[in-house]
Amino acid sequence: MPKLQTNGAKQKRTTYMILLLWAAVCFALLVVDWCCWAPNRLDADMASEQLLANLLAQEGGVMSTNWYYSTELRVLNTQLVMAPLFRLFTSWHTVRVVGSVVLILLYLAAWFWFGRSAKLKYSGLLGAGLLVLPYGALYRQYVLEGLYYIPHIAISFVVLGCAVRILRGGRRLAPAAGMVLFSFAAALGGPRQLFILNIPLTVAAALLCWLDAPPADTLRQKLANAWRTPGGALLVPTLAADAAALAGYLVNAKVLAEKYHFQDQGYVAFTGLNLDRLQWFANALLASFGWQEGKVFSLAALFNLAAAALILFCFVFSVWLVRGKARYPLGHRLVGAFFLAGAVCFALLYGLTNSGHSDRYLLPLAILFVPLLEIMLADCTPRHRPDAYGLTALLAAILLLRAGTDYRAAAVATNPNQGAAQFLVQNGYRDGYASFWDGNVMTELTDGTLNVWTLTPNSVPELRPWLQVTSHLQTPPQGKIFFVISKWEAYGERQPTTQALADAMPEDALIYEDETVKIYGFASDEAMRQACGFAAFP
């Protein structure tokens, strides 16, 4: 018997070291990407977050009245990490790399909190590697490089971990307080977290209570039975978290909206059933799981097969979890119910309202494949364990291959704004105009040297109150200025055409041209407006 125990302990140590190596390799590859290749794929949204963090570092606050935010206010968000780093480093790239490391470590800490709460094998080391692996273009752009969704997903892991601990019994006050506090803080930024976390979690808890309740002759008795089930212990904390989230959103809409500049979500209204938007939801779900366009006879087919398998696994296994009262721990069943409730919530939101939508909005739902996969490995029977381990290893290998192709593409990519930004700095330009898609990128690439007034697509230089300092709409650029016309933008490939704006530029003012942009130089803002026939600065 001692020998068998020794062999078992040795096998566990070996497995632990393999999983630790897996997570370390995945993390190391991501750090190499940040250090060496991230500037190659820097985009306007990523750069805008850095501009905000730099502004907050100068002002010494966590929010700013001198910034035009986008769809939500940044409260419990990435600027809490990035802004202090600007007081330590002058290189914006260094700030981005160090800040990314810190944020990913916080992301993993939230995951391990959930893993320990749910008693996953090795606290979820396999999942830790998957979380830092770019399994799809959207996840790479908006989580691992852009970092935007790290707060949303990390908060979900923390609150889910608290919920699982409540269902395990023992101390319940501290986890319940954590659910309430994180729900309130997250909702201060806007209503997004309610749809990502609070509403699905409440529905999931209620669903499990209903399914686990003994049969009854009346609805009232059934509800009473549901309340007395083991899952009933979670109902009060989830409802309290809902109340806290609503209170946070109320502060956002009624108090913070009066002081800060961000898009109001009050426009969202119910509509009739929109089949086109439901079709979009299905396609967005595919994309958020890593589906990509490409030739059938290529690696894209393998990656898309993995994405489809993950979607099928998440839905089927979640149903098994919800229905498996006798087989699965209640906390694990909660995760399955949470995934199903989240999918239904998003489908209803986009199918029955006019809410704004983007493929990336489903990333917090798609990433639940990681805890579901870990739960499957933790709960599978000895009979099915070899098959489960083998299929998981195959999936991990495919996703690692997918990540390798992504990193290879990043290594050979070039940022189209790099040459233009260097030219402007070398020739003494500091202030000027560009589209949103170019301007903030140029600022980050030059460590804040270029100060760019970003424009909305129009036939005249109309400033856009979106992800730039408010002073840009009050005062014009100073000294000699530049005006960037992106060729792809002039051709209307991403935004409504600005060909009229391009046509207004006098050719004798052209100072730089490459395959992506034309740049025009003027002695002053007033000189530019006179030469182009534009009205005076507002």
Give the residues covered by each predicted segment.
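Signature aromatic-anchored transmembrane alpha helix within multi-pass, membrane-resident enzymes
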Residues: 15-24, 174-181, 239, 306-313, ...
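Membrane-proximal lumenal/periplasmic loop motifs of glycosylation machinery
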Residues: 35-44, 57-83, 93-94
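Membrane-interface alpha helices of multi-pass inner-membrane proteins
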Residues: 174-200, 243
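Transmembrane-helix motifs of polytopic, lipid-linked glycan transferases
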Residues: 98-122, 158-161, 313-317
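Juxtamembrane segments of multi-pass membrane glycosylation machinery
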Residues: 61-63, 80-102, 107, 119
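Hydrophobic/aromatic-rich transmembrane helices and adjacent perimembrane loops
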Residues: 147-155, 301-311, 333-383
